[in-house]
Amino acid sequence: MNRIIVCLICSLFNVSLFAQNYGIVLSGGGGKGAYEVGVWKALEEYGIAQKATVFSGTSVGGLNSAMFTCSQTDECIRLWREVVPVELTRDDEFISQTGLKKMLEMVDLSRLQKNIYPKVYVTAVRDSYTTLKIISSIFIDWADRTKRFLLNTEKDVGEIKNKLLATSAVPYLTNPVRLSDGYDYIDGGFENYGGDNIPLVPLLKNHPELDRIIIVYLDFESKVSVPEDLKADVIEIRPIIDLNGMLGSIDFSRPTINRIMDQGYEDAVEVLSSKKMYPVSSYWFED
């Protein structure tokens, strides 16, 4: 009976609890992506993660989008705390592609091919245009070189993995990734090359049904333009401290990952609390 009463009260006075369609935008930023894991943990505790129907991510945001969709939160935390510090620093590379491939093998990406799981978009840039982008940016609009891939429509799990590798292939630090369309692609977060590091666009274009969109930034100064006539409510979560810029992007040490992950959790809780939202357990009582 107590649970029924609580649900009735919430339906009258806290409609936000029952908003059914959430979209999640995850930014790029290499090692700073641990922040998004902390945010995701908070979203789960607040009952929001369970209502996410679509993700849009760039670079590490794309990797996390797939991971959050296909793995339990505890497993995501374990991968970041135990696997990332070892695998992504092997082979004397800034970001080991070999290690990243091994990490992706630990995630059941075939779940993206099932309709019961959220949609996941990732952003990448055609590599053949990067040099021309630098030379000709003042003359040509290169926005169409940014490619948005909906992973759920891909029939080949191997191609899903390749698209996740492509969205996180940092120029000059890792090799471009050849996809099934015959083009080479690089990290979608490099906006000087035509990328989009805060990929809100796929949600705006394809998902008008969303009740709320949560945008997670990895830089406390970042800001994306949100249309004034957007019907969905937008909640922005950003670090309240500097995550050390580019140096933070290539820092995969365990202490840094733990610190940044905790920061993401704390910042998310602060934002959600300010929106008069509460952990799911707060709405239930023992019989």
Residues of each region from the PLM?
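Sec-dependent N-terminal signal peptides
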Residues: 4-19
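Gly/Ala-rich beta-loop-alpha elbow adjacent to hydrolase catalytic centers
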Residues: 57, 61
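Patatin-like phospholipase
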Residues: 18-55, 66-287
